């Protein structure tokens, strides 16, 4: 039935135990997430994924919102356990009866299996029905005393929490005269560094040109700043990863975004790319040239 080494996580467990938070966490880890797919559709879905060749990690949420799917879920878990899909894992989210009742009362929602609106009866029935699936789970997380943030941390810890390939860095340059980038996490002002704009032969070049780059970098002030700032970034980035961030945008700004910020962004991006996936962009590098051309 399953014939590939795609990474598949079956996310299941008690209703109200945190599957919504789990799905959001898997999305941040780079998983393609599908919520409540009827198990009979999984083989066809799997074939489509395999043909596309673009999806390598899948998180599939299955639960008992419809009791009609129960036998199919158990059979699917049995097949995953017995044969070809060797890279599959089952994550079972659990919580105490008392905590689940409290959560349902807080949200004023009814349990999907509750008869005549009695929440505890629905919980007991669901726990009984899910027992065979829970016994097959490789990872069980009790969310009774976990906040959404703590549950997210547990999922990251168990599923590639320290895989820096899922963490991306955007290093961008910009000009303060055109406004701050609204999506930046870290903004650094480098207008205190020597400005190539005042060197006539460099004015119309950019920080990507060797002459401008060398002019900016030869300053002792630039070198001291660079070493200290990169040291700071290398200190805080592992903390961002541990916190569960999937990306961070570092914005380097000078007056017009043409010289100093471009040169520094290039050097910083190249250094960080030795350890992390990095994308570099220069928001305002060509704006002065475009303005001149329009005039």
Swiss-Prot record:
Q: Which residues bind ATP?
A: 13-20
HAMAP family named in the record: RapZ_like
* Protein family: Belongs to the RapZ-like family.
> Is the keyword Transport assigned to this protein?
no
The record's section on Gene3D superfamilies has: P-loop containing nucleotide triphosphate hydrolases (3.40.50.300)
> What GO molecular-function term can you cite, just one?
ATP binding
Function text? Displays ATPase and GTPase activities.
Signal peptide bounds: none
Which organism encodes this protein? Ligilactobacillus salivarius (strain UCC118)
The protein's superkingdom reads Bacteria
The record's section on Pfam families has: PapZ_C (PF22740), RapZ-like_N (PF03668)
- Annotated residues for binding of GTP: 63-66
Name of the protein in question: Nucleotide-binding protein LSL_1171
Q: Which InterPro entries match?
A: P-loop_NTPase, RapZ-like, RapZ-like_N, RapZ_C
Keywords, ordered alphabetically: ATP-binding, GTP-binding, Nucleotide-binding
């Amino acid at each position: 039935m399953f014939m590939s080494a795609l990474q598949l996580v079956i996310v299941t467990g008690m209703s109200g135990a945190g599957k919504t938070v789990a799905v959001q966490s898997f999305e941040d880890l780079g998983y393609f997430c599908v919520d409540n797919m009827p198990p009979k559709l999984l083989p066809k879905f799997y074939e489509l994924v395999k043909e596309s060749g673009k999806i390598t990690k899948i998180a599939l949420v299955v639960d008992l919102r419809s009791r009609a799917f129960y036998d199919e879920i158990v059979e699917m878990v049995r097949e995953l356990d017995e044969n070809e899909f060797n890279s599959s894992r089952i994550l079972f989210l659990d919580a105490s009866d008392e905590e689940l009742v409290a959560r349902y009362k807080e949200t004023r929602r009814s349990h999907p299996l509750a008869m005549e609106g009695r929440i505890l009866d629905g919980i007991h029935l669901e726990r009984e029905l899910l027992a065979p699936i829970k016994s097959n789970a490789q990872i069980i997380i009790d969310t009774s005393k976990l906040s959404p943030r703590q549950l997210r941390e547990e999922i990251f810890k168990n599923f590639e929490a320290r895989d820096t390939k899922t963490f991306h860095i955007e290093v961008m340059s910009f000009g303060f005269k055109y406004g701050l980038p609204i999506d930046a996490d870290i903004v650094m002002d480098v207008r205190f560094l020597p400005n190539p704009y005042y060197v006539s032969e460099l004015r119309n070049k950019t920080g990507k040109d060797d002459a401008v780059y060398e002019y900016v970098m030869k300053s002792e002030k630039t070198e001291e700043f660079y070493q200290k700032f990169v040291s700071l970034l290398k200190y805080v980035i592992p903390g961002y990863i541990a916190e569960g961030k999937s990306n961070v945008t570092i914005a380097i700004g000078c007056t017009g975004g043409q010289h100093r910020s471009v040169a520094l962004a290039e050097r910083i991006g190249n250094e960080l790319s030795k350890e992390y996936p990095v994308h570099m962009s220069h928001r305002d590098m060509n704006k002065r040239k475009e303005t001149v051309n329009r005039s």
